């Protein structure tokens, strides 16, 4: 099953990475995990400029469709299919990951409107707000800052850039959900304290965001960095 194989595919670091790795090689891998894939996927979907343009207004969502990353998609899956499978299997958006299938780990997190949502336990039907995945964060930021043209197509969301600068990921499997949670938090609180960051990641219903590599301190540093960049 593709979802079950993904941790192996993405956990490409050597044993040296257990000590946070060496500078340039580790940074290159982090950029690949966090940034390059997001920009490439967004561009491949509809073309970066068209994606930015589509986000200037919220399209109507016809019955049987969902609005994802600024684009309305007709869905073929049955009504009880979890949103995660629609995103990954139909729309080929692999930012959200299958972790537990119970909404308990956060690897599958996406934004519905401005709020973090566990897509593995959320049916795709009846969603009235836009869904944003990791791939859609650059366009979301471009819309917020009114960026156009080349600047819009090449600019990562500050949260993504902060994850790169702080070299947060180790295996990287959970980090899409972590970044989504960070965007949710910074939308509600533009300058969170360390205690507030910890609370957001550990007390978000239905359960905490889990990182089995233990990157929590780097995540806190990245959220602080992103907050400064977004100020």
Where are these regions (language model features)?
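Signature of N-terminal electron-transfer/Fe-S-associated modules in redox systems
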Residues: 2-4, 10, 16-231
